């Protein structure tokens, strides 16, 4: 996103306050979450301190990301910004979320994918996304599913890609 808000909103998803740029590429994504999460996002998202922290962290990352052309060469930068946002906003300081990220990193390590994957905190709820670090290198994330399930998480393998 280049400006806050969803670029697509309303009943027909035609217009919204945000503006975004991107590219289309098939990218596998493992999503993992607890069946019974601790705090629900609604318990803190309206807190003025959290709003300020999240807004400032988002603004800093958007400033960096809004410069230059958008194509797959920016993937690593996007991953770095996602991690920086979770730290700067304080969301990654939450013990329950931090534990989820650690589980994802340990599972990636055991699967021999530590250097090939990035474990990212999802910003709403308590969940993580595990994605490849290098889009030009084909890796299988399927091995992570059973390991994450063994850790007590619900999981799914999905992908980013062209809109149908």
Residue ranges and their predicted role:
Residues 1-87, 94, 135-137, 149, ...:
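ATP-dependent small-molecule kinase catalytic core of the GHMP/sugar-kinase superfamily
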Residues 60, 114-115:
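Active-site proximal loop and beta-alpha junction motif in alpha/beta enzyme cores
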Residues 93-114:
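Short amphipathic alpha-helix segments
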Residues 99, 103-104, 139-152:
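Short amphipathic alpha-helices in soluble, non-transmembrane regions
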Residues 115, 134-139:
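Active-site signature of cysteine proteases
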Residues 118-123:
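Short beta-strand
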Residues 126:
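Glycine-rich phosphate/pyrophosphate-binding beta-alpha loops
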Residues 129-133:
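Short hydrophobic/aromatic beta-strand micro-patches
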């Amino acid at each position: 996103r280049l400006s806050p808000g969803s670029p697509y909103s309303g009943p027909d998803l035609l217009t919204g306050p945000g503006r975004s740029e991107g590219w289309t590429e098939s990218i596998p994504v493992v999503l993992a979450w607890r069946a019974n999460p601790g705090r629900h996002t609604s318990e803190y998202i309206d807190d003025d301190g959290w709003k300020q922290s999240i807004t400032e962290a988002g603004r800093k990352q958007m400033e960096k990301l809004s410069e230059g052309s958008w194509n797959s060469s920016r993937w690593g930068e996007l991953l770095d910004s996602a991690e920086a946002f979770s730290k700067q906003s304080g969301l990654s300081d939450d013990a329950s979320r931090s534990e989820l990220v650690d589980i994802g990193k340990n599972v990636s390590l055991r699967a021999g994918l530590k250097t090939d994957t990035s474990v990212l905190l999802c910003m709403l709820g308590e969940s993580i996304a595990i994605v490849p670090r290098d889009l030009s290198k084909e890796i299988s994330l399927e091995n992570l599913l059973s390991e994450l399930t063994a850790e007590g998480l619900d999981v799914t393998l999905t992908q980013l890609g062209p809109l149908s």
